[in-house]
A protein has these predicted regions:
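Conserved catalytic-core motifs of eukaryotic protein kinase domains, centered on the activation segment
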Residues: 152-154, 215-216
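Terminal amphipathic alpha-helical/low-complexity segments used for targeting or macromolecular assembly
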Residues: 2-11, 18-106, 217-224
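Left-handed beta-helix
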Residues: 106, 111-112, 117-118, 123-132, ...
């Protein structure tokens, strides 16, 4: 009976200890500062995951201008969604410097207000411009010289950003006008000018160039 009493008292003490620890943890999680740190950690993890995905599709090369442009944009949008404070203000200042560097040095202009899905692939650099309200879906591919959201048709249209669905490919030199919607899996060919909505899975190509035969110098001399 003494042994049973000893074991019972130990179990009771253990239970009380666990209950006290659980109570402490509950109170700790209610501390605002800890909640902020947890949210910050989760936000950093999500940012990290997005950047790793972008790095993977952009040739797994951190020196690629396209990857750097996207990474800077990810940082900016992540900071914009954080609560205000001295740290946020300082990091936003760093973001603005990086944004201008990417725009001026690589020729890739992605305003902070652009919405970009996961795993965007920017092939090559220079001349890639996004409308400030553009929306880009997951797994899209955009090549050099593309303009996503050229303005025309007055103020109403100018303030409507184009929307690209998922897995859309945009060829070099293509122009997609403001307010245009591109469906999933569509392909916009090189130098195509898109002024109206494109259904999912469609292919848009510019007209084939005409071959013009000019008279040779010998033929021109004979005509004289």
């Amino acid at each position: 009976s003494d042994l049973v009493g000893l074991l019972t008292s130990e179990d009771s003490a253990t239970r009380q200890h666990h209950m006290s620890v659980r109570s402490i943890l509950i109170h700790v999680t209610e501390v605002p500062m800890l909640g902020t740190l947890v949210r910050l950690y989760r936000g950093i993890q999500e940012l990290r995951n997005q950047v790793i995905e972008d790095w993977t599709v952009n040739s797994r090369d951190w020196t690629m201008p396209g990857f750097r442009a996207i990474a800077v944009h990810r940082l900016g949008t992540w900071l914009a969604n954080r609560r205000s404070g001295v740290v946020k203000s300082g990091l936003l200042a760093v973001y603005r410097v990086l944004y201008r560097y990417v725009r001026n040095h690589y020729g890739i202009e992605i305003p902070l207000t652009v919405t970009i899905g996961r795993r965007l692939w920017l092939v090559h650099q220079h001349g890639i411009v996004f409308h400030w309200k553009a929306e880009i879906g997951d797994d899209c591919l955009i090549r050099h010289g593309a303009t996503i959201g050229a303005g025309y048709g007055g103020q109403k249209t100018l303030h409507k950003g184009p929307k690209l669905g998922q897995r859309v490919e945009v060829g070099p030199g293509a122009v997609i006008f403001a307010g245009v919607k591109i469906g999933d899996d569509a392909v916009i060919g090189p130098n195509a000018v898109v002024m109206s909505d494109v259904p999912a899975g469609a292919r848009v190509f510019a007209e084939a160039p005409r071959v013009i035969h000019l008279p040779t110098a010998h033929q021109a001399a004979r005509k004289k």
